[in-house]
C-alpha cells in the first residue's frame, strides 16, 4: 500500500485526482457551502460558492491550488455540500463552520485576532489588535501605511486627507519623486482605510436594516442588522406566515439594538465586514 501511495503522489496532478472527480458529481448550480472530508471523517477544508457544481469541478482541473488545499485534495475521501438560498447566506454559514471546525486547509476566518484597529497613542497613530472605534480592518499592511500617513495628526483620520494631498502636490512640484511616491502610496492606503471605516460606521449606526438577498421565488432569507451586528435571521414565506416572521425579526433586532456602538470585535467583525461587501452589490442581487 505504501508503494501504491508513492506512485500516486509521483503521478501528474490530473491523473492523481481523476478518480476523485466522481465525488462532486451531482453538485447543483446553486449557492451553498461544501466540506472536504478525509477517510476518518475529519473536515479538511470548508468553502462557499455561488455555483456549487462549477466551483467543485474546478478543483479537479489542471490548475494547482495553494499547497494546503492541494494536501486536502490528496487526502480527500468524500465531499459534502449544502444548498442555501443565496450567496450571502452561504458566506455567513461558511463563517460559522470555519469558527466551529477550524479546518486545517483554510487560511482565513479561523483567527479572531487577525483584525487590526487604528489608534492614537501619545502624539502619533499606531496599529493595534485592541478593539476601538477605528476598525476593524482586515489588512495590517494597509493600516500601518495609513498610520504612517497620519503621523502626528490630531483629529479624525479622514480630515487629514486634504492637507496630505496638498503636501503631495508640493513635494511633486519640488521634483522629490521618491518622497512623492512614498507619500502617494500612504495616502492611497489612508483613503482605503477611511472608506472602510465610513462603511462600517454606516452599518453600526443603523437602528434596523433588513437585508434580503435574491433567492428562488417563493421564499427569502432575511437578515436583520442592528447595533453593528446581525441580530436575527428569518425565512420569509409568502402570505401571513412571512409577515409574522418579519415582525419577529424586527422585534429581535429592536431588543438587540445598542444605543451607541462604536467598537466591533470577534464574530461581529466577521459578519459586519461580510455584510459591508455584499451591500456594495447592485440589485436585483441584493435588496435592502
Language-model segments: residues:
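N-terminal cationic and glycine-rich segments that engage phosphates or anionic surfaces
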Residues: 3-288
